Amino acid sequence: SGTSIGANIREAFYAHGKADFIAKLQIALKECYETEYWIELLTESGYCGDEKVLNKCVELKKILISSLNTAKKNQ
């Protein structure tokens, strides 16, 4: 799910119109939520003690939400 975020963002840049762009960003956001879940599991189980990874995922999620809101307003 982590690598899918970047792949879907890249696809959004080459979307076939605004609706396709929004759809790709929505998929990226869903993948970001899934990645956040896995990072939380790794953190809680002790496999990943670095909060920076989770913080970066949360920050990326905020960027995607903001980008989606802007794209929907300009649709």
Summary of predicted features, one role per range:
Residues 1-7, 11-75:
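Short, C-terminally biased terminal segments at protein or domain edges
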